[in-house]
């Protein structure tokens, strides 16, 4: 049974007024009586709509600079009253039923994000009446529709037209879920903000607590269910932040191909975040969350060709990311050369999409162009807890490097060193990257000892016939012993970039001098676990 409820009276009180006039006009045209408050009521009246101020309806004025508007029994009784059960008491107290509540809340997140926002500003943007009405209407969803998203306005009008001015219980229940999600996210923002202000508020410090409040409330929205998780016996889903600020795998649109898997999304994220490091046309190929080939060039076609040459075996079934539009020539090169799981780029030409369409299973994602990298938080789940840290947005330029050896790097060695340092940031620790002429030639990832990562990078280069002599090597952390330098020298590396900071730095530098290697210290580590 659909359990339809007619909408005869609606209360509208919104901070975000996008679409509210048109929605109110549609409701009024269908015979719905409009109640409203403050700025919303003034806007509707200015547009010629018949609207009753809540203060006139309740007989009680707004007061305390608008802090008290809707907190009245005639409002909440009208919302919470159970049809067929509370009718007598509603009639006794002259409480009219309110069939629809349209509310979105004070812009707390936007307020506290503004530079110079004071605690007092934040406090005044904590909505009280709004969440109370939202929760009341959601609780009584059997009789009342609660609308918190302007994106639902059109669908609601269409359903009312299809049901003689009524909404079904299924729709009201779905709207109630959205309402509880809305208030939960709102309260989470407030709790996080105040949690970060605890020391300052109690006089323990002149500074706020910082990025990490004493309780962390997170709000993510399910974007899609996965066929399964990392393995076929695990269930999984993909959740995204409500307001993603940066082009990412979360914002990407899939324009062709099979449904994305859990591993596809994880690997695509790794590839895209790596390719964002480069200003020049770049290509990153990822397999099992590790780059297996990276290159920059004057075109993405050449960048792809050079990235593929690093490790064609591992590139099979990989994820390919670009930082420029996917063009037809590059799309043809990929489709003709290899099996690929996912291609992601800021955009793709129509000709390129016609070419990839020939391989229907290939997933093509368009993420949009990104600007400056947005600061944020990284999370790592542990059993019973959550590790939280800032995103690793650390970068170094040539002017920040310290040459610690007798020999200075050549211009090409320096360029290659900076290039492979960017790549090493996205390779699982212990990470070693060999690079020459703006392309990776060997990558050693995830080994328990750094020397073995160095050896693997050399083996990879040798297997593909790539010349290591004259190359640069990046290490994501310091060398605890000289053996990693000896291994690199044996392979032909002539320049090393690493953080430094080992108690045996002197021995490591001496080893580099013995081999005639130029060594650069970044004073910044890039562990990745």
UniProtKB/Swiss-Prot annotation:
A Pfam family annotated for this chain is: AICARFT_IMPCHas
InterPro entries documented for this protein:
AICAR_Tfase_dup_dom_sf (IPR024051), Cytidine_deaminase-like (IPR016193), MGS-like_dom (IPR011607), MGS-like_dom_sf (IPR036914), PurH-like (IPR002695)
Can you give the residue ranges of the MGS-like domain? 1-148
Q: Which domain of life is it from?
A: Bacteria
GO cellular component term of the entry, any: cytosol
Q: Which GO terms describe its biological process?
A: 'de novo' IMP biosynthetic process
Q: Where are the transmembrane segments?
A: none
UniProt pathway annotation: Purine metabolism; IMP biosynthesis via de novo pathway; 5-formamido-1-(5-phospho-D-ribosyl)imidazole-4-carboxamide from 5-amino-1-(5-phospho-D-ribosyl)imidazole-4-carboxamide (10-formyl THF route): step 1/1; Purine metabolism; IMP biosynthesis via de novo pathway; IMP from 5-formamido-1-(5-phospho-D-ribosyl)imidazole-4-carboxamide: step 1/1
One Gene Ontology molecular-function label: IMP cyclohydrolase activity
Q: Which UniProt keywords apply?
A: Acetylation, Hydrolase, Multifunctional enzyme, Purine biosynthesis, Transferase
Show the CDD domains listed in the entry: IMPCH (cd01421)
NCBIfam families reported for this sequence:
PRK00881.1, purH
Query: What is recorded about the domains?
Result: The IMP cyclohydrolase activity resides in the N-terminal region.
* Name of the molecule in the record: Bifunctional purine biosynthesis protein PurH
Q: Which organism is it from?
A: Escherichia coli O6:K15:H31 (strain 536 / UPEC)
């Amino acid at each position: 049974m659909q359990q339809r409820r007619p909408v005869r009276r609606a209360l509208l009180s919104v901070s975000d007024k996008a679409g509210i006039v048109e929605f109110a006009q549609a409701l009024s045209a269908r015979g719905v009586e409009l109640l409203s408050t403050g700025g919303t009521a003034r806007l509707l009246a200015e547009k010629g709509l018949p609207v009753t101020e809540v203060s006139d309806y309740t007989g009680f004025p707004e007061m305390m600079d608008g802090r008290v508007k809707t907190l009245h029994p005639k409002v909440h009784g009208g919302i919470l009253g159970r049809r067929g059960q509370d009718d007598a008491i509603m009639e006794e107290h002259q409480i009219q039923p309110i069939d629809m509540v349209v509310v979105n809340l004070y812009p707390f997140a936007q307020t506290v994000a503004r530079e110079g926002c004071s605690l007092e500003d934040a406090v005044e943007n904590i909505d009280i009446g709004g969440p109370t009405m939202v929760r009341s209407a959601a609780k009584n969803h059997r009789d009342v529709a609660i609308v918190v998203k302007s994106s639902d306005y059109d669908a609601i009008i269409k359903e009312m037209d299809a049901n003689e001015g009524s909404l079904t219980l299924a729709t009201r229940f779905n709207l109630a879920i959205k309402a509880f999600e809305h208030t939960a996210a709102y309260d989470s923002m407030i709790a996080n903000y105040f949690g970060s202000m605890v020391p300052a508020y109690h006089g323990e410090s002149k500074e706020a607590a910082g990025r990490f409040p004493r309780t962390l409330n997170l709000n993510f929205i399910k974007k899609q269910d996965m066929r399964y998780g990392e393995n076929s016996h695990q269930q999984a889903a993909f959740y995204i932040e409500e307001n993603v600020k940066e082009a990412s795998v979360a914002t990407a649109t899939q324009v062709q191909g099979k449904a994305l898997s859990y591993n596809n999304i994880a690997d695509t994220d790794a590839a895209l975040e790596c390719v964002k490091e480069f200003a020049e046309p770049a290509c990153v190929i990822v397999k099992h969350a590790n780059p297996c080939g990276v290159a920059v060039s004057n075109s993405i076609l050449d960048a792809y060709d050079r990235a593929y040459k690093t490790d064609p075996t591992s590139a099979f079934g990989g994820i390919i990311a670009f930082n420029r539009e996917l063009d037809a020539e590059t799309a043809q090169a990929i489709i003709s050369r290899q099996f690929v799981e996912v291609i992601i780029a800021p955009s793709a030409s129509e000709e390129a999409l016609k070419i990839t369409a020939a391989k229907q299973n290939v997933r093509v994602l368009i993420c949009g162009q990104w600007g400056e990298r947005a600061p944020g938080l990284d999370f790592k789940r542990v059993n019973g807890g959550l590790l939280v840290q800032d995103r690793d947005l650390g970068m170094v330029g040539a002017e920040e490097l310290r040459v610690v050896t007798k020999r200075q790097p050549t211009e090409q060695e320096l360029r290659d060193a900076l290039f492979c340092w960017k790549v090493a940031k996205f390779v699982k620790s212990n990470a070693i990257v060999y690079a020459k002429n703006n392309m990776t030639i060997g990558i050693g990832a995830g080994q328990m000892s750094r020397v073995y990562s160095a050896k693997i990078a050399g083996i990879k280069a040798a297997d593909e016939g790539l010349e290591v002599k004259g190359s640069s090597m990046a290490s994501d952390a310091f060398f605890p012993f000289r053996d990693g330098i000896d291994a690199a020298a044996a392979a032909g590396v002539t320049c090393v970039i690493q953080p430094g900071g080992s108690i045996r730095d002197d021995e490591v530098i001496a080893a580099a001098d013995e081999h005639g290697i130029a060594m650069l210290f970044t004073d910044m580590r890039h562990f990745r676990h």
